[in-house]
Amino acid sequence: ETDGEIVACIAYRTFAPGVAEMKRLYVKPAHRGRHLGRILAETIINITRERGFDKIILDTMVEMKAAQQLYHQLGFYMIPPYDDQDPERIVCYEKQLQAKFHVKIVAA
């Protein structure tokens, strides 16, 4: 929010057990270039991790190159469509939130 105007938004939903889906990341054009998208995405990643999700998924339009670059920088990787998305128009991403291994320390 800037001067009472909402300039950016983001949401997430539970997609499946252990899987969050990032939704609706949007920054108004006049406010782009100020890292608001990155801040919002990092916030959702941290919230979903703290809430115990194992991974977070999202989709974006093929032409949204800046968004795709941001997702790569945040550690997302491309995955096949997961919810009847049109692969000609939509690119899907995933990021692991929880470590998939456990460390056991044994005294010698």
Predicted regions and their residues:
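Short polybasic/polar patches that bind polyanions
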Residues: 32, 49, 72
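C-terminal "cap" of GNAT-fold acetyltransferases
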Residues: 54-57, 61-108
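Residues within alpha-helical segments
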Residues: 42-45, 49, 61, 68
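Acetyl-CoA-dependent GNAT
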Residues: 1-23, 28-29, 41-43, 47, ...
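Conserved G/P- and acidic residue-centered "switch" motifs that form tight phosphate/ATP-binding loops
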Residues: 35, 52
